[in-house]
């Protein structure tokens, strides 16, 4: 899963 807090590319 993606998390914006960890990886801004997922936002």
From Swiss-Prot:
UniProt keyword annotation of RNA-binding present:
no
Locate the Cysteine amide modifications and list their residues. Answer: 11
The entry's other comment says: Negative results: the native peptide has no effect on nicotinic acetylcholine receptor (nAChR) subtypes human alpha-4-beta-2/CHRNA4-CHRNB2 and chicken alpha-7/CHRNA7. The synthetic peptide has no effect on a wide range of mammalian and insect voltage-gated sodium channels and voltage-gated potassium channels.
MF terms from GO for this chain are: toxin activity
Q: Where in the cell is it found?
A: Secreted
Q: In which tissues is it expressed?
A: Expressed by the venom duct.
Task: Cite the domain annotation text.
Answer: The cysteine framework is XVI (C-C-CC).
Disulfide linkage:
2-10, 4-11
> What UniProt keywords apply to this chain's record, in alphabetical order?
Amidation, Disulfide bond, Neurotoxin, Secreted, Toxin
Entry superkingdom: Eukaryota
Keyword hit for Secreted: yes
Organism expressing this protein natively: Conus pictus (Cone snail)
Q: What does this protein do?
A: Potential neurotoxin. No target has been identified for this peptide.
Listed GO CC annotations: extracellular region
Name-wise, this protein is: Conotoxin pc16a
**Major localisation:** secreted
PTMs per UniProt? Pc16a is the amidated form, whereas Pc16b is the non-amidated form.
